[in-house]
Amino acid sequence: MQAKVLPLKTIRNPRDLGGYLTQDGHKVKMQRLLRTGRICNLSRHDQQYLINYGLRKVIDLRSEKERKQDPDTLISGTKHFNISISPEDNTEAGTSFEDLFKKFDANPTAAFEHMRENYRLMITRPHSQRAFHRVLEEMANTPEGAIIFHCSEGKDRTGLTTFFILYILGVDLETIRQDYLFSNYMLNDYRARRDLEAKEKGSSLAFRANLRLLGSVADEYLDNAIITMCEEYGGIDSYIKKQLAVSDELIDLLRKLYLE
């Protein structure tokens, strides 16, 4: 099944996770779990669409620095929760071209290894593990209405959050992977704009290659997270139960709330 893209013009990568089938024959409910990029500077149209769509909660996965730089638009009738997946110093989102240039101007594949390492860190850091747990708990505390969970581009921190909730709901790994990779299609225009800006600034081809890698998802990034869970924590199920402290009761509640 193809991803359900929301008709929002001022939000990057907006999708409803509803409609995905689970391995035991259930379906993820529509208008419940929405994954997006940042939601600053929303148009009135997009705000009203989300209100009409039943939005009740917004979970901001970004760092405090990012939130201050590009604060969420406060949407009428919704509650906002700040749950940072990454510490302040572990995301390139919101970083200036000048600072990125210092890091990624020479080696055209530096960003690839940087992203793989970021995914490993999101799995191994206690900070991130606690944050994923809090997000899942907040989902379990939402008996009705829609939740937006978002980072900056809606692909990495949001991508792993989506991985965990869909896996817990019983969606198969290949479907989860295809949903994750769909961010590349959704962010094509965004990457093109960034590349043009870098070109106009006279940036090197190596830097522009790295910029595209930073604005993309890849099988290898997600695989590094999965491999880390399997090799260091005994598997995905073990990781979710032990490192994310997700109980059988929490799993049952999430499935009750988000499946039909």
Placement of each model-derived feature along the sequence:
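Cys-dependent protein tyrosine phosphatase-like superfamily
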Residues: 1-148, 161-260
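Ser/Thr-glycine-rich phosphate-binding loops at phosphate-binding pockets of nucleotides
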Residues: 153, 157-158
